[in-house]
Amino acid sequence: QLFDQVVKGFPTWLKLDKKENPVQFKIQVWHAEHRIGFPWSEIRNISFNDKKFVIKPIDKKAPDFVFYAPRRKPDTIEVQQMKLQDFEQKTK
């Protein structure tokens, strides 16, 4: 569960790499210096539902990799009003 320890509260990226061979792919999830890689040949299924991204390996005994994509929360009314005031001041 290295991934859970690494990414809590920090931005995380999901990347699909294509190697020189046109049929060889690799999925990488990383934050800062920590990287988790999945060769395409070892992935059985990939699914995404709302904020949950799941990678299932071919080895059924191996645990599924679950990645929760961060979503930006909508601005509160106070923040929206402050942004509107700032915009109005800049346009004057």
From Swiss-Prot:
It is found in: Apical cell membrane; Cell projection; Cell projection, Microvillus membrane; Cell projection, Ruffle membrane. Residues 42-92 are annotated as: Interaction with SCYL3. A head-to-tail association, of the N-terminal and C-terminal halves results in a closed conformation (inactive form) which is incapable of actin or membrane-binding. PANTHER family: MERLIN/MOESIN/EZRIN/RADIXIN. Residues 1-72 form the FERM domain. Its main location: membrane. Keywords: Acetylation, Cell membrane, Cell projection, Cell shape, Cytoplasm, Cytoskeleton, Membrane, Phosphoprotein, S-nitrosylation. Probably involved in connections of major cytoskeletal structures to the plasma membrane. In epithelial cells, required for the formation of microvilli and membrane ruffles on the apical pole. Along with PLEKHG6, required for normal macropinocytosis. Pfam families: FERM_C (PF09380). It is a peripheral membrane protein. This is Ezrin. The lineage of its organism: Eukaryota, Metazoa, Chordata, Craniata, Vertebrata. It comes from the Eukaryota. GO terms for molecular function: actin binding. Interacts with PALS1 and NHERF2. Found in a complex with EZR, PODXL and NHERF2. Interacts with MCC, PLEKHG6, PODXL, SCYL3/PACE1, NHERF1 and TMEM8B. Interacts (when phosphorylated) with FES/FPS. Interacts with dimeric S100P, the interaction may be activating through unmasking of F-actin binding sites. Identified in complexes that contain VIM, EZR, AHNAK, BFSP1, BFSP2, ANK2, PLEC, PRX and spectrin. Detected in a complex composed of at least EZR, AHNAK, PPL and PRX. Interacts with PDPN (via cytoplasmic domain); activates RHOA and promotes epithelial-mesenchymal transition.
